Design a protein with these regions (language model features):
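Amphipathic hydrophobic-ligand
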Residues: 68-70
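Intrinsically disordered, low-complexity acidic Ser/Thr-rich regulatory segments
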Residues: 1-66, 76-81, 109-132
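Forkhead-associated
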Residues: 72-115, 119
Length: 132
C-alpha cells in the first residue's frame, strides 16, 4: 500500500489521506509546474500566481497568448480543500478551461497531468507537481 510520511510528526499515512491522521498537516505538493504543450517551456512556482497575456507571451513563448486577457487565471493553494486550484479572473473574453471544461468562478482542483487551456484548444498548459 502506498503511503506518505508527515514532515511535521513523522506519521506514516495512507496515500489517499489528504491530511496527516495525527497532526492534520496537509499533504499538498509544494511546487506546481505548468508546461506549454506547444513550446515545452515551463513556469514553476510555490505560491499563488496570476497568469495572463504577458506571461503566456514571454515565459511560454506561445503564439496562442494573443487570445488571453491581461489577467486570465490564477493558481492558488486552498488549505481547506488541501489542493491547488485554478480559478478564472473575472471579465476575460475567452474562458479558462481545465481538461476541456470551463472553470467555474470558485475554481477547480488541479491534478497531475491535467491541462489548463484558453477555450478548449488554445494555450494548453500541462500540470505537474514536484514532491515536497
Amino acid at each position: 500500500m502506498a503511503t506518505w510520511i508527515c514532515p511535521e510528526d513523522g506519521t506514516e499515512n495512507p496515500a489517499a489521506e489528504k491530511r496527516c491522521l495525527v497532526c492534520r498537516h496537509p499533504n499538498l505538493p509544494r511546487v506546481v509546474v505548468l508546461t506549454s504543450l506547444a513550446t515545452g517551456k515551463e513556469a514553476e512556482f510555490t505560491e499563488a500566481k496570476k497568469f495572463g497575456k504577458a506571461v503566456f507571451t514571454h515565459r511560454f513563448a506561445d503564439d496562442d497568448a494573443k487570445y488571453a486577457a491581461d489577467l486570465q487565471f490564477e493558481i492558488l493553494r486552498d488549505d481547506d480543500r488541501v489542493a491547488w486550484l485554478v480559478r478564472p479572473c473575472p471579465g476575460t473574453p475567452n474562458k479558462t478551461c481545465y481538461d476541456g471544461f470551463a472553470v467555474p468562478a470558485e475554481g477547480v482542483e488541479l491534478a497531475e497531468g491535467g491541462v489548463i487551456s484558453l477555450g478548449k484548444t488554445k494555450m494548453k498548459l500541462k500540470v505537474r507537481f514536484k514532491k515536497n
